[in-house]
Regions:
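Positively charged n-region of N-terminal signal peptides that target proteins for export
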Residues: 1-5
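Bacterial N-terminal signal peptides
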Residues: 9-17
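Sec-dependent signal peptide cleavage junction
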Residues: 18-29
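Exposed beta-strand-loop-beta-strand "reactive/processing" segments of non-cytosolic proteins
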Residues: 47-90, 186
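Short beta-strand edge/turn micro-motifs at domain boundaries
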Residues: 88-102, 189
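Extracellular ectodomain segments of secreted/surface proteins
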Residues: 99-124
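Short proline/glycine-enriched turn/loop motifs at strand-loop junctions of beta-rich domains
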Residues: 127-133
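Ser/Thr-rich low-complexity repeats and stalk/linker segments
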Residues: 134-193
Length: 193
């Protein structure tokens, strides 16, 4: 009888452990503090931000530099939904905002930033139905133009490390081409608007 009770107890413990592990995996992969910080920053920097509507973190990606994370989020202002980005540094289980707060009503946006004094070009966007397979970014500094392969997913972020002596003002893309399945050019209106 004791053997049966022991087996029953251990089985129950195993099932409970598996259940709690599954519940932990379904929780959000980012802390609530990030969402709160973004909402506060939007209140401070966007006079048109509608704080009665939710701010939703839709993607969090580890940046190329250790301890940095870039977050994509959506929010509502005027009569439009916006897609924004912000970069955080993780220190001792705390996330501190360090850069960003760029946003767009379009499906694509790009920016430049420094992470530990290293320059990066960042392009992010909404990729409904995984239509976009690749972006080609043309810059004023033609030698810095580059191609960004886009991973599958509803939202994407692509980082491009730049040489240390890069003039970030010349890195702002003035033209972006979108390519879909079979490397076919997607018209800008379909790609970004």
């Amino acid at each position: 009888m004791i053997k049966q009770l022991t087996i029953l107890f251990l089985s129950s413990l195993l099932i409970l452990s598996l259940y709690s592990s599954a519940v932990a995996q379904t929780q959000t992969p980012y802390p609530d503090t990030i969402e709160r910080q973004i909402k506060e920053l939007l209140k401070e920097t966007r006079t048109y931000f509608d704080s009665s509507k939710p701010v939703k973190v839709v993607k969090m990606v580890k940046a190329p530099k250790k301890h940095y994370y870039t977050v994509l989020f959506t929010y509502y202002a005027y009569s439009n939904d916006y897609l924004g980005s912000a970069t955080f540094k993780k220190e001792k289980d705390r996330y501190t905002f360090i850069n960003g707060m760029g946003s767009t009503v379009q499906k694509l946006n790009n920016d430049t930033m420094y992470l530990d004094k290293v320059p990066y070009s960042v392009v992010y966007g909404f990729n409904e139905g995984n239509r976009i397979k690749m972006l080609r970014l043309f810059t004023l500094d033609k030698k810095s133009s580059y191609t960004a392969p886009i991973k599958k997913g509803t939202y994407f972020i692509h980082f491009k490390k730049l040489p240390l002596n890069t003039n970030l003002e010349k890195m702002k893309p003035f033209y972006i081409d979108c390519y879909g399945k079979d490397n076919k050019l997607i018209p800008w209106g379909e790609c970004a608007e």
